[in-house]
Amino acid sequence: TYNTEFLARGEKNAEGRYPILDYLVASEADIICLQEGVAPKNLKSEYVDSIMAKAGYHIRRLHDGKAEPQFVYSRLPVLSVHRIAYESTTNGSLAVELLYGQDTVLLVNNHLESYKLTPEDKMKYKEIIKDPESGHAESNSRELVRKMAGASRLRGPQVDSVLNYVEKSGRKAVIVCGDLNDSPIS
């Protein structure tokens, strides 16, 4: 599972290739889950899908306008795809049932609420970790805790929704993955 930050913003290398696509295909993974996998304007989704299809992947995405699309590329047959309902304008969780031999595996690809820390916030966080006794540590800590608490209040119900979905599915074989955004520096 990868948060590709919009497929590495569609950057090409000196040979004119997209290293992110080369990396994904070279991984030879049976299942690839992407968060922030929307292709930028210079790298069309159709092109990405054609590369992944040539590499033997079934392509599933859910883009219903309720959140950023979630992507799953699987070499296993895909039986169904569903969005797990929870409140968010940018994040989402995608439930995909895959056929593995005679069994059905439930795969949940998550992109949960982030702390939305700015680069400046991340520097403050690193400074607090490096020198918790510094003069700014207390004020910086209060400011960061306020931001982090807000994101945690949103992420908690998202996690509950995923857990409820998994429990109600009754599946014994479950893979839960994705960008859980539970680290302040993520």
Locations of the language-model features?
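Active-site beta-strand/loop signature of hydrolases that rely on acidic residues for catalysis
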Residues: 2-4, 20-45, 107-110, 147-186
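Short, surface-exposed linear patches
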Residues: 21-28, 54-56, 94-96, 128-132, ...
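Structured beta-strand-rich core segments of catalytic domains in phosphoester-bond hydrolases
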Residues: 31, 35-126
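Short beta->alpha connector loops of Rossmann-like oxidoreductase domains
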Residues: 8, 80, 184
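Short amphipathic alpha-helical segments, especially helix-boundary/capping motifs
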Residues: 20-26, 69, 135-140
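Mixed-charge, polar/low-complexity N-terminal
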Residues: 13, 52-53, 59, 140-142, ...
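Acidic/histidine-rich helix-loop elements
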Residues: 1-17, 39-40, 116-151
